[in-house]
Amino acid sequence: RPGTDKVAPYDVTLGDALAVYPFGNTVGVSVITGENLWKALENGVSNWPGDGRFPQISGFKFSFDTTKAVGSRVQSVTKTDGTAIAKDSKEYTVAVPDFMIYGGDGYVGFFTPSKAKLRGLLVDVFIEAVTEASSGGKAITIPALDGRITKVNP
């Protein structure tokens, strides 16, 4: 795990999973517009490096600049193939913790709770993904190394 003194490869235990997902949240599938995705990311970086609203993402990339004013920090949002995600009404399907769908951590108004479909517990989804990845011999990518989130200023 990044941020520990452990050296890869290492085992992921049930205790690790419960430490990462201690709150019993479920995964929700929702739709978000490009415009609201940008706004949600702005919310996520608005208190950098403060509170816990910083987003954990997959399937796209974004860059931000903390020297810019709050509301103008996100510099780019792209799909992993490099295609730009515009601040428009195009809709994207996303998986997101239920507490964010319902406005937790300041994520108010970005998702439509009545249209969200709640799935399993986050911890169970995580355990299933790690089990599948490790049994199939796939490498588990450490997010800090794949460039999903880039802070453009020092």
Positions of PLM-derived features:
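Catalytic centers of hydrolytic enzymes
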Residues: 1-154
